[in-house]
């Protein structure tokens, strides 16, 4: 009975370590996509299902580190002075409001909460914010609203538009491949040690090394008797 209790205890510890790793470095491929344009404002609401157990809330940018914290909620609301290039407002309903967007606002924003009863970690909500420049929008609007009349200008603009879109598509695809590779690598790194450690613990609990050693000793003893 003690053997199984000890095994269950170790498995629980390993699962907690895995949960903490996923909380500290979450998978950004599942983030909610948000887009905005320079000079505009953008609102990031929290999760729709806030538990009554939740007591502490916070917003982060780029990573779940104290230096990247934007807002902190306990019994009162506090706006942290980190990230001076990001002008924002934090509201009591836990919404993050980004003001006067620029290219510096692009990135991952995390909304994190922690259960105070039982200290149960969960994956934070994240937004992948992309800010586009107004100049790019103006070019596309001009092409659509004012089509050229001459054949030469039409061919030139069509060629330019096709080249621009192709370059954007290739750049976007390359970025996706690189992001998926960067995301897959750290997750693979902790799975392999977890499997190895779990296997060793199971072998020790069921005394497989001791049984193997006893069989080896008995085999050597029988060999010595046969030789004599």
Curated annotation (Swiss-Prot):
It is a single-pass membrane protein. Glycans are attached at residues 41, 93, 100, 128, 164. InterPro entries: Ig-like_dom_sf. Keywords: Glycoprotein, Host membrane, Membrane, Signal, Transmembrane, Transmembrane helix. It is found in: Host membrane. Its main location: host cell. The keyword Signal applies. Residues 1-19 form the signal peptide. Belongs to the HHV-5 UL9 family. This is Uncharacterized protein UL9. It comes from Human cytomegalovirus (strain AD169).
